[in-house]
Structure formats: structure tokens, C-alpha cells
Amino acid sequence: MKIEKKIWKIWSTHPTNDRKGYRLTELLAKGSLLVARKELNRAYEIFSQIILADPSWFEAWNKRATVLYMMGKYEYSQKDINQVLKLEKRHFGALSGQGLVQTELKNYEKAINSYKKVQKIYPSMQAPKVMISHLKELIKGQSI
């Protein structure tokens, strides 16, 4: 868990150590606070602003994907997740989010594949194991 926290801290800090990087890091933190407060429209605007300023910062895409998921805009969330994974293919948070999105879209096999990728990257994470088991039960229930 300590390593996971360090990874999230790294991902949530803009990779440049200049004024722009500090400003974008602060904006990401502000957007994350808005998400916690369920002020999703404002958070969406902030993450979009960060993406415009630096489209290569995958964590801004990931945060916006989370907001879109929370808004029930699953297809748009998936598009942002695709961008995250294009920029950082080992982003276990985005892969987990993809599993959630695909579950909502009832694409259970795709969701399972996403969670299997998470397991390869982060074997000690428990949520993917639980979700895979749950999804397999859903698939079984559909075939009856």
C-alpha cells in the first residue's frame, strides 16, 4: 500500500518542476477536492483546462475520466481512459476504471480483461479479484 501511495503521489505531481508544472499540480489537487465534494461540473472544467494546457499529462485525463464515470457518461469516460493508457499503459487506476466502465456498459468480458491487466501490474490489489469473480457470476446468470 505504501508503494501505491507513492505511485499516486508521483502521478498527481506534474512532471516538470517549473512554474507551469506547479500551477497544474495545484489545479489537479483543486479538481480532486471538487470531486470529493461531488462538484463534478467544476471538477470537469478544471481537468479539461489542465488537459488543454498539457495533453501529455495522463493523470489529468484519468481524473477527468473518473468525473465522467461519476456523471454516468461512460462512453466519454472510456475515451479519456484510452488516452490515459496510450500515455501510460501501466496505469492500474485507469485500467480499474475501464473495468468499471465496461461493467456499466454490460461488456463483462472486456471488464474482466481490464481487471486481469490490473492483476498483472499490481498482483496484491484485491479489488480486481473480487470484480472478476462477480463478473463471472453475472455472465453465468446471463447464460441460464
What are these regions (language model features)?
Residues K9-E26:
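TPR-adjacent "capping" and linker segments in tetratricopeptide-repeat scaffold/adaptor proteins
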Residues K2, T13, N17, N113, ...:
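Terminal, low-structured helical/coil segments at or just beyond the last alpha-helical repeat
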Residues A36, M70, E104, H134-G141:
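Register position in tetratricopeptide repeats
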Residues W11-H14, D54, E88, Y122:
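Alpha-helical junction/boundary sensor with strong preference for TPR arrays
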Residues L85-K116:
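Ankyrin-repeat and related helical/solenoid repeat scaffolds used for protein-protein interactions
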Residues K5-W8, S48, N82, K116:
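Alpha-solenoid helical repeat scaffolds
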Residues G21-G93:
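Alpha-helical adaptor scaffolds
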